[in-house]
């Protein structure tokens, strides 16, 4: 069985510069990023975070849907025309802290945060 994650990322409209936060489920984050970028040409994605449950192996999709139902009133006003894939998974900018708190309450921990990750530096010259 493939490793599962709940991911969160920042989403920004390339034209209006409007920002929102996206929460979703995936078992292949690299493929999901490519799918989002290819399908939603008017949006940029950044600062990905991956959340993993401490003991759960299955049920990630159910937890993601539970969070979406609970937070429906905070959805960003993005239409299907501008974002064909995943427009119902985007929330108002600044709501990511509440989403992280809900994930933490459900037992998820952040295992990767792109905004704080720094790739290893190789020295320019080695003697």
What are these regions (language model features)?
Residues 1-127:
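Non-catalytic accessory segments flanking enzymatic or RNA/DNA-binding domains
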């Amino acid at each position: 069985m493939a490793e599962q994650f709940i991911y969160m990322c920042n989403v920004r409209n390339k034209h209006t510069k409007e920002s929102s936060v996206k929460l979703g489920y995936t078992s292949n984050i690299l493929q999901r990023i490519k799918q989002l970028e290819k399908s939603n040409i008017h949006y940029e994605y950044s600062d990905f975070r991956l959340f993993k449950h401490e003991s759960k192996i299955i049920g990630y999709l159910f937890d993601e849907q539970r969070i979406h139902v609970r937070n429906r009133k905070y959805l960003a006003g993005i239409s299907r025309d501008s974002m064909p894939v995943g427009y119902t998974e985007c929330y108002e900018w600044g709501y990511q802290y509440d989403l992280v708190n809900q994930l933490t309450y459900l037992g998820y921990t952040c295992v990767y945060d792109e905004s704080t990750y720094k790739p290893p530096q190789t020295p320019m010259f080695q003697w």
